[in-house]
Amino acid sequence: MSSLHEHLRPIPEPFSLTLLLGTRETPVTFLFHYYLYHALKAKESTCFLTFSKTLDEHAISMRKWGMDIKTKKNFFFIDGFSMLFAPISKPSKVQAPETKNHIKSVFAPVIQCVEENDFEFENSTIIIEDIDILQSTHALDSTKIQQAILELRKCFSRVIVNVTLGAPLPQQKSLGSSIGHMATRCISCRPLTSGSARRITGFLRLSRMPNHFRSGICETPEDDDKELLYEVTEAGAKVYSKGQVTLQL
């Protein structure tokens, strides 16, 4: 058994795009919190844009990591969920406007956040949760989502984005594949293919993608593609090599 940081660097390399692929059975929420915790701890200006959850949901989970994100001055939350699914009852700190397949409308609050808070590019991170919801709600099509990611990479040194895959969701699979071709690294979580193991959540695969960023020789173990077993805990995840766990058939 080992901790996640022994296999995955706490903060992605500069000028990187990290793709997180999950399923309904194996969501990647713990990876969001892993990156969020370390980015805020490192004083990175961190923008968190979600299309599926509320600030309170993430704040409760992050308290288990020993961090109150609501008090962090370098944390900027953008509520894309309310923009898509709920009428605006009162002005929020940063609220995405109504949109119909228009990139600037969807991501205007992000640009506003960067401009108003004088982000330093070298020390900036954006985490986008469930970007595929933009496609399934017809807010943006796949091509425009990819274009938006390219534009965001001009504003943030590190971009972390996730897509949730599933058998009934062929469009999400296609979107994930398209973003994967743009990414420097992909981290995917999927259920066990057969059998079960006590406490094991599923498989965690770390993969270098076509645009993998390298500056000199990286001495971290993350340079190697690998597949591990993992167990989600209240404050992170425990990781096991395949030989450490016996599956119960």
Swiss-Prot record:
It holds the Pfam family ELP6. Keywords: Cytoplasm, Nucleus, tRNA processing. Belongs to the ELP6 family. Component of the elongator complex which is required for multiple tRNA modifications, including mcm5U (5-methoxycarbonylmethyl uridine), mcm5s2U (5-methoxycarbonylmethyl-2-thiouridine), and ncm5U (5-carbamoylmethyl uridine). The elongator complex catalyzes formation of carboxymethyluridine in the wobble base at position 34 in tRNAs. The keyword tRNA processing applies. It comes from Schizosaccharomyces pombe (strain 972 / ATCC 24843) (Fission yeast). Coiled coil: none annotated. Pathway: tRNA modification; 5-methoxycarbonylmethyl-2-thiouridine-tRNA biosynthesis. Component of the elongator complex. GO terms for cellular component: cytosol; elongator holoenzyme complex; nucleus. One of its GO terms (biological process) is tRNA wobble base 5-methoxycarbonylmethyl-2-thiouridinylation. It is found in: Cytoplasm; Nucleus. The gene is elp6. InterPro entries: ELP6, P-loop_NTPase. This is Elongator complex protein 6 homolog.
